[in-house]
A protein has these predicted regions:
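Short, Lys/Arg-rich, polar N-terminal cytosolic tail immediately upstream
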Residues: 1-6
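Hydrophobic cores of alpha-helical transmembrane segments in multi-pass integral membrane proteins
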Residues: 9-32, 38-39, 43-106, 111-164
Length: 164
């Protein structure tokens, strides 16, 4: 890594941290408290972006898995794996922040409606994807199975989106 690249990365990290702090200040200081839901509504500033980032990450898994099966280049498999890891992190955040919001609003931590259940299924599919990647022998067969699972898993996202 060149000195210029290191400096650019350092500046980017500091700008990201500063933007995060400004965003937190805006959420907790300047944004008025919603009358019906109260302060718990502020969790939506984390919950909804986490959901979209999870969906986007799983879309990358979908595209890279198709490209891997088509071109058989390991590079696409690596991109799919990295995106799946990121997607599982954000989907986990969704499944944690959602019940925190739901308890005071609905009076229950979890309700078995279509959106919540299909989001849990999505998370389970991609956790299974990661387990497959880390528990089987290295090889093209593992990558092909994972690619198929990554493609099938993505098919749950339109169902989640339109399940309201």
């Amino acid at each position: 890594m060149s000195e210029e690249t290191k400096e650019s990365s350092s500046i980017l990290i500091w700008l990201t941290a500063l933007s995060f702090l400004i965003g937190m200040a805006a959420i907790f200081i300047y944004v008025p408290t919603e009358q019906t839901e109260g302060a718990v509504q502020r969790i939506m500033y984390f919950h909804i972006p986490a959901a979209w980032l999870a969906f986007f990450s799983f879309f990358i898994v979908f595209i890279c898995s198709i490209l891997f099966l088509w071109k058989k280049e390991r590079e696409w498999d690596i991109y799919a794996l990295a995106s799946a890891e990121i997607g599982v992190i954000f989907c986990s955040l969704v499944l944690i922040t959602g019940p925190i919001w739901a308890r005071p609003i609905w009076g229950a931590w979890w309700v078995w409606d279509a959106r919540l259940t299909s989001t849990l299924i999505l998370w389970l599919i991609y956790v299974s994807y990661l387990m497959l990647r880390y528990q089987t022998d290295v090889g093209s067969m593992r990558a092909r199975f994972a690619a198929v699972l990554g493609i099938v898993g993505f098919l749950d996202i339109p169902f989640i989106h339109f399940s309201v």
